[in-house]
A protein has these predicted regions:
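Short, Lys/Arg-rich, polar N-terminal cytosolic tail immediately upstream
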Residues: 4-22
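The first (N-terminal) embedded transmembrane alpha-helix
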Residues: 30-44
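Membrane-embedded alpha-helical segments that form the functional core of polytopic membrane enzymes
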Residues: 47-80, 129, 136, 140, ...
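Functional transmembrane core segments of multi-pass inner-membrane proteins
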Residues: 52, 158-199, 203-204, 220-221, ...
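Intramembrane alpha-helical segments
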Residues: 101-171
């Protein structure tokens, strides 16, 4: 009887360990960031002039979400030592040693390749190419090159987060059109104030990690001014475009 209980306990521990591991790898995908990519790419698909089936649409969203998650995994792999220094990130799975760094790297690369191939298979070469550029841009331009070198890191690097609606659009149409530029610009302009607000709140964290976020370089007061300016710009831009549309309809 004792042996049966022991085997049962071991099986239960093994099952719990498996699901814990799955949870750790899911957290590497940065689900909250991934949800924004899913939403904006879906909007890009919906407003695109073209027709796709629900099945195709689901696979396109799946490919984009996997690509976004793969970027997050590779980002956390590269920043695993930096994350140890920050209160906000020290409890992530890599700094805590819950999964191996090699496992995270292989996971991120595998998902990247799979997402690009899946999008190419279900949609077209152009959308798959833009997804590839987005992943490479986020990892090499933002994470590796810009993040620890300039306070403009999120201004330039934020373009990576603005690509999903273009990917969704091109997955449906097979081409890039000026119409989708509005959504790209809105997300591009929204990204810096969002991260600067976080940097104001977590400036000590960024200082310890050696990341030159805007508040550490120009001070809180100027950062707040920049946040206001960047926040008002999209409003002004959309108002202008709406005004132009009304005039075009009237005339």
């Amino acid at each position: 009887m004792a042996n049966i209980t022991s085997v049962s306990d071991k099986r239960e521990i093994g099952i719990n360990s498996f699901f814990s591991k799955v949870g750790f790898y899911i957290s590497l995908l940065k689900p909250r960031v991934m949800s924004l990519s899913i939403f904006t790419s879906f909007v890009g698909m919906i407003i695109a002039p073209g027709f796709i089936t629900i099945y195709e649409g689901a696979l396109i969203i799946l490919a984009i979400s996997i690509g976004s998650g793969a970027s997050g995994a590779l980002n956390m792999w590269y920043e695993r030592k930096t994350d140890l220094l920050m209160e906000r990130t020290k409890n992530r799975v890599l700094p805590m040693g819950l999964i191996s760094s090699n496992g995270a790297l292989i996971y991120g690369i595998t998902l990247s390749v799979f997402s690009i191939y899946l999008l190419y298979y279900v949609a077209n070469f152009l959308s798959a190419s833009i997804l590839l550029v987005t992943i490479l841009y986020y990892i090499f331009v933002y994470t590796i090159w810009l993040k620890k070198r300039t306070p403009q890191n999120i201004v330039i690097g934020g373009a990576a987060g603005a690509f999903p609606p273009i990917i969704g659009w091109t997955a449906v149409t097979g081409s890039i059109s000026p119409e989708i530029s509005l959504l790209f610009i809105l997300i591009f302009l929204w990204t810096p104030p969002h991260f600067w607000a976080l940097a104001l709140y977590k400036s000590d964290d960024y200082k310890k990690a050696g990341i030159p976020m805007m508040p550490l370089v120009v001070g809180n007061k100027k950062t707040v001014s920049l946040i206001i300016a960047y926040s008002l710009t999209p409003v002004s831009y959309t108002h202008l475009r709406a005004h132009e549309t009304v005039l075009a309809l009237v005339c």
